[in-house]
């Protein structure tokens, strides 16, 4: 199943396999792209959700909220980033 990432005025919705993740846009503090092969999130400060298959991919889009970090693994990182920052 392909991943779907959509944004409207109220929320970001990420659907992948059986997951249906909804993030209120009011909680999003930052959206960034990351292509560092050894990128390591700060494990002490937040809960982390990794979404997508990590096999053979270093392209990520990261959504930061106050208490959570969502890491989206995708080959379409620019498309996902553009959708989230529109």
UniProtKB/Swiss-Prot annotation:
Q: Source species, please?
A: Staphylococcus haemolyticus (strain JCSC1435)
Give the top-rank taxon of the lineage listed in the UniProt record for this protein. Bacteria
Under Pfam families, the record lists:
bPH_8
> What is the recorded name of this protein?
UPF0457 protein SH0868
Q: Describe the family membership recorded for this protein in Swiss-Prot or TrEMBL.
A: Belongs to the UPF0457 family.
For this protein's source organism, the top of the classification is: Bacteria, Bacillati, Bacillota, Bacilli, Bacillales
Q: Which InterPro entries match?
A: PH_SunI-like
């Amino acid at each position: 199943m392909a991943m779907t990432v959509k944004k409207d005025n109220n929320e970001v919705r990420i659907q992948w396999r059986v997951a249906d993740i909804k993030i209120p846009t009011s909680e999003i503090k930052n959206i960034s792209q990351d292509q560092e092969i050894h990128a390591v999130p700060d494990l002490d400060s937040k809960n982390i959700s990794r979404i997508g298959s990590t096999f053979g991919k270093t392209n990520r889009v990261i959504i930061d909220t106050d208490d959570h970090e969502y890491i989206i693994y995708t080959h379409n990182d620019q498309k996902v980033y553009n959708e989230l920052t529109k």
